[in-house]
Amino acid sequence: MRILAKWLALAVLLCTTPAKAALDIVITEGVDAARPIAVMPFVWQGPGAAPQAIADVVMSDLVRSGTFKPLDELGLPQRNIGTAAQFQANSWSSVGAEALVLGTVKPYGTDQYLVSFDLIDLVKAQNQALKGPVSATEFLMDSRQTVISAAQFRQYGHRISDIVYEKLTGIRGAFLTRISYVVVNHTQKAPYQLMVADYDGVNEQMLLRSPEPLMSPTWSPDGRRLAYVSFENKKAEIFVQDLYTQVRTKVSSFPGINGAPAFSPDGKSLAITLSKDGQPEIYIIDIATKAIKRITNHYAIDTEPSWYPDGKSLIFTSERGGRPQIYRVELSSGKVSRETFEGEWNLGGSITPDGRSMIFVNRTNGKFNIARMDLSTRFMQVLTSTRLDESPSVAPNGTMVIYGTTYQGKQVLAAVSTDGRFKARLPAGQGEVKSPSWSPFL
């Protein structure tokens, strides 16, 4: 429960309104090819109605992962079962799902509830059933129970989703994560708003409102701080804000451009873009001491730094070849090498958490789309077909990318799986949305 408790501490500090999605999630492609899974409503073992439907959270998470497709509850062969002991393997032979999630919820003191869930391997259960009677332990992939409060139902639903996803894919789930983004609503006197929400757009909280532009939010590796660019003082400045204490620290306010902050893997420094010495160049600034080190030195524009996971190199966008392309600089030697060659432009790059791929914006035939390049084979795959894509940010498990795009003339957020198969759009209820950033694991 340590992970859930840490996440809840942040959620309580940030959330001042009931759980509600500020960003809708409209899935546009990829569900039909997903892996079928059964998620049954958790059986309520108390008086009246259950506080919340945990199974609904789990089903929504699994759909949004792009990997799984929960089956319609009405077509499931058993109803109102909450434990593996009630599961009848022979009844599920024609369902076609690979796993079943089921559970129970019951009161456990004042504002406390005991939540239990089981994850059943349906394929293994059916194969074993053909050989004769089997015990539940032979096909049980996971079984847990936890005491939570009513306020923790949604978060624990995300935790169950994380467990199920990892058990079935071998990849850590990223459902207990958050996103930051900028909302622009010109009907308000201070139209620029820096927001934080759960990964699915629920529990949105405003961190800052300004009459001047806000841009480029990025998370610290521990998920405790955000760095961003603000023009609130009529010039570009970089701030770091603690999400727990709300304390803001001005990190960079040099003449000219102060932009594109990116936390180092140890969280102690920021890679930033400064133009204080002429052309925009890449620098590293120590957050505590404000000491800076210049990394690039070229007459062309260098911007949009991003760290390799090992902290030994940066990638950045540069026009030193005539058009925007992505380059790598080794911090120990200063050696610079060009990384991208396909298409007209390539910019806004970031390395996936496993260090194997790069996600970036590719322009080909005048169209801006999100692309992925395998760093070992150099094979590039265009992932999206939306318009004017920008600002890609990778989920901490490397399976999904959130990015800004244009839909029906408005700036919105969208998501695409890193294999390009699953796609979704995240329109806001009010205003336009841009500059998304996905948190680390929390």
UniProtKB/Swiss-Prot annotation:
Signal is among the record's keywords: yes
Keyword presence, Cell cycle: yes
Cellular component aspect of the GO annotation: periplasmic space
Localization terms from the record: Periplasm
Subunit structure: The Tol-Pal system is composed of five core proteins: the inner membrane proteins TolA, TolQ and TolR, the periplasmic protein TolB and the outer membrane protein Pal. They form a network linking the inner and outer membranes and the peptidoglycan layer.
Family: Belongs to the TolB family.
Function (record text): Part of the Tol-Pal system, which plays a role in outer membrane invagination during cell division and is important for maintaining outer membrane integrity.
Protein name: Tol-Pal system protein TolB
Species this protein is from: Shewanella baltica (strain OS223)
